[in-house]
Amino acid sequence: RTDCYGNVNRIDTTGASCKTAKPEGLSYCGVSASKKIAERDLQAMDRYKTIIKKVGEKLCVEPAVIAGIISRESHAGKVLKNGWGDRGNGFGLMQVDKRSHKPQGTWNGEVHITQGTTILINFIKTIQKKFPSWTKDQQLKGGISAYNAGAGNVRSYARMDIGTTHDDYANDVVARAQYYKQHGY
């Protein structure tokens, strides 16, 4: 089972903002931009597919969601230097922030992906408590947003991404995850 926290295909999304799409060299924004970026990352992502699926099954999170976060955070490792990104604070494929967590494992290994996914699950659980009337799928989206900007930043369903990087984090990750789900994740 990988659907304990909702199903990414049931989540509405506006996709990438122009602030996210433009630096990628795209002249368009939205879901199609997210899917294009995810497609560009697919070859690199496929190197980690087995581990991503194993962790997803172990922790009952859709592997596609993990892949969506990895694409957004590190372009499947392509932008990292010795496993580090984000001015030396973010570690690994999932960019675990060393200011909030002690990074575990190698930057691209199972231990790291397990740590990042566990951090995501903890945010989903916090959002479940904060917004008990939301559907499971809405809570999943809220947890994805919180992975970027913290649970305190999630104030309403419609505006959860305001305050995330480029104000589009969960919407972009969800659209990328939908792409990865179509590609066997």
Swiss-Prot record:
One GO CC term, this protein: extracellular region
GO process annotations (BP): defense response to Gram-positive bacterium; killing of cells of another organism; peptidoglycan catabolic process
GO molecular function, one term: lysozyme activity
Keyword line: Antimicrobial, Bacteriolytic enzyme, Disulfide bond, Glycosidase, Hydrolase, Secreted
CDD domains attached to this UniProt entry: GEWL (cd01021)
Record-annotated disulphide pairs: C4-C60, C18-C29
Superkingdom of source: Eukaryota
EC number per UniProt: 3.2.1.17
Disulfide bond recorded as keyword: yes
A Pfam family of this chain: SLT
Catalytic residues as annotated in Swiss-Prot or TrEMBL: E73, D86
Main EC class the enzyme belongs to: hydrolase
Gene3D superfamilies per the UniProt record, alphabetical: 1.10.530.10
Reaction catalyzed: Hydrolysis of (1->4)-beta-linkages between N-acetylmuramic acid and N-acetyl-D-glucosamine residues in a peptidoglycan and between N-acetyl-D-glucosamine residues in chitodextrins
Cellular location(s): Secreted
PANTHER family named in the record: LYSOZYME G FAMILY MEMBER, LYSOZYME G-RELATED
Misc: Shows preference for N-acetylmuramic acid residues that are substituted with a peptide moiety. It acts only as a glycanohydrolase.
Protein family according to the UniProt entry: Belongs to the glycosyl hydrolase 23 family.
Designated name of the protein: Lysozyme g
